[in-house]
Amino acid sequence: MKISANSIRTGNILVYNNDLWVVSKTPEHTQPGKGGAYVQVEMKNLKTGTKRNDRFSSSDYLEKAELEQKDCQFLYFEGNNLVLMDTKHFDQINVPKEILEAKLPFLTENMIVKVEFYNDKPLTIVLPPTVILAISETDPVIKGATVTSSYKPAILENGIKVKVPQYLAIGEKIVVKTDDMTYVERAK
C-alpha cells in the first residue's frame, strides 16, 4: 500500500530498497524558505539492525508493508525463542527473542500479545499498552508523604527500574506503560 511521505509515523514498517525498515523516530516535516517541503525520516533495517536517515519530498509516495496481525498467547521460552499460541487456530509459533528487545521483561506467562506478520514471517510483537507489576525494591515509605510530584527509584518484580511516588511500598502493585517504562498509577 502506498502512503504519502507526510503520512509516515513512528512504528510504520516501510518496504524501501527491497528491504523492510521500521520508522524509529518521529519524522521531521520541514518547509524551507527556498525549495520544496520535505520529510526527514530515521529508519532501522529489520534484518540487519542498521539505521539510516533519508529525506523524502512531501509529494513522494512510499510502500508501507501490509502486515497481518494475530492475537497470540505467550506460553514459554525455548532457547532463544518465545513460544506463542495463535488464539484463533491454536497453532504454536516460535518467535526469536530479539524481536522484543528491551520489552522482553514485560512478557508474562499467558499474556495476550499481537504479533505482526509479513509474508507469514513474524516481524514485531505489540505488547498491551500497560501491565500490572509488583514493587520488589524501593526506599521505605516516608510518613506523611502525600501525592506529590517527588518520585523515588523502584525495582519491579521483572527487574525494570522505574520512578514511583514516595507513598508506595515494597509489595504494592502498580500500572506501568510498556512503551516508555513509566509509572501510571497504583493498581486497583
From Swiss-Prot:
GO molecular function terms attached to this record: translation elongation factor activity
PROSITE patterns assigned to the protein according to its UniProt record, in alphabetical order: EFP
Keyword tRNA processing: no
Record's GO cellular component terms: cytoplasm
Source organism, top-level taxon: Bacteria
Coiled-coil zones: none
Protein's cellular compartments: Cytoplasm
Family named by the database record: Belongs to the elongation factor P family.
Protein name in the entry: Elongation factor P
Source organism (scientific name): Rickettsia prowazekii (strain Madrid E)
